[in-house]
Amino acid sequence: MVFKNLRAIREDNDLRQSDIAKILNVSQNTYSQYENGVIALTAEVLIKLSDYYGVSIDYLLDRTDNRK
């Protein structure tokens, strides 16, 4: 599964994959695999991303278009 919102929100904030990888304490390659759906996002990663961007986990997972 590819999470289009994960990439879109990163790009909307003018961030690189390496920027988010540092926040998550993972490699850029690992973050790229999250974004492309190669590696499943853990609950911990989803919570960190949701808190960082101020959006709901459902938004990150493309389950809604509502950011909150």
Language-model region placement:
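Alpha-helical residues within the helix-turn-helix
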Residues: E11, K22, D51
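Short alpha-helical DNA-recognition segment
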Residues: L15-Q33
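DNA major-groove recognition helix of helix-turn-helix/homeodomain DNA-binding modules
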Residues: N25, E44-Y59
